[in-house]
């Protein structure tokens, strides 16, 4: 019964969001180059200040210095609001964030999670770029399960608002993707999200926070360097970082996934929402 209600809710959200969206154009998937990036928006959990303080004290300074030594100046200076992503969509329509807020499913209660395990990863192995250095979320506990369930309903509700696939999963990345990833890009505009298939939840979401965003070619030198960085920081934070996410934000995102602007913030405690620029409450 619960599964049936969950499925119907996702389908209803999908239909209501799709009604407000522009047509979805997948023609970029037939091209060898990346799709031109107009604007990407997303739903993310901000990292709490206590987590940022630990990362600033134990990771970020050393990491920035190491990036500069490697010649990765752009990566060392990339602006970002530290976060864990729920879902990203591409849309050139500036009204998209407001539509996302309207379509956003009820968020979960505050999420108790553990951030643990630094690792480098590529958008698609062998594509060359983009690539990232991430810090994962421990895949157990109520907080993780709630995150996964919310990814499923949020993806169903918001993916119809896209105008096509995320540029970073097109071109050389799409060409190197496995079939399961390609199917998600075709149907949801992005890989790495959860969907309902035949009444069952199919999970591909891997929640994490990203410390390095790069479009440099991921050659053997950088692969080795990023493995060393991950090993170094795993030794510094072997137990990870326990924290609680208390809000979820609608944000604007750069090509590689970094947050460049927070637009709306929704409390996980009472569901209230604010316009970040004005500080005023929005919605009911």
Where are these regions (language model features)?
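N-terminal targeting/docking segments
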Residues: 1, 19-22
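Bacterial N-terminal signal peptides that target proteins for export
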Residues: 1-7
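Bacterial N-terminal signal peptides
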Residues: 8-17
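Basic, often amphipathic N-terminal segments
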Residues: 21-128, 137-246, 252-284
């Amino acid at each position: 019964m619960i599964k049936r209600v969950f499925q119907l809710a996702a389908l209803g959200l999908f239909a209501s969001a799709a009604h407000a969206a522009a047509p979805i154009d997948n023609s970029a998937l037939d091209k060898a180059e990346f799709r031109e990036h107009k604007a990407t928006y997303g739903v993310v959990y901000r990292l709490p200040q206590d987590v940022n303080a630990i990362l600033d004290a134990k990771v970020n300074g050393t990491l920035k210095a190491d990036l500069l030594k490697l010649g990765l100046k752009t990566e060392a200076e990339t602006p970002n609001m530290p976060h864990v992503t729920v879902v990203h969509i591409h849309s050139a329509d500036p009204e998209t964030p407001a539509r996302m807020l309207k379509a956003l499913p009820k968020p979960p209660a505050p999420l108790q999670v553990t951030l643990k395990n630094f690792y480098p990863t590529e958008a698609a192995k062998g594509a060359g770029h983009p690539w990232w250095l991430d810090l994962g979320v421990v895949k157990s506990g109520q907080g993780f399960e709630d995150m996964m369930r919310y990814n499923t309903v949020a993806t169903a509700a918001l993916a119809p608002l896209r105008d096509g696939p995320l540029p970073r999963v097109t071109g050389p990345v799409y060409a190197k993707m496995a079939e399961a990833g390609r199917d998600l890009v075709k149907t949801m505009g992005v890989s790495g999200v959860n969907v309902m298939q035949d009444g069952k939840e199919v999970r591909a979401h891997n929640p994490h926070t990203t410390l390095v965003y790069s479009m440099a070619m991921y050659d053997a030198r950088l692969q080795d360097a990023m493995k060393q960085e991950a090993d170094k920081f795993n030794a510094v934070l072997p137990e990870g970082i326990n924290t609680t996410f208390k809000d979820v934000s609608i944000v604007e995102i750069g090509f590689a996934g970094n947050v460049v602007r927070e637009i709306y913030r929704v409390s996980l405690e009472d569901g209230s929402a604010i316009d970040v620029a004005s500080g005023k409450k929005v919605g009911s």
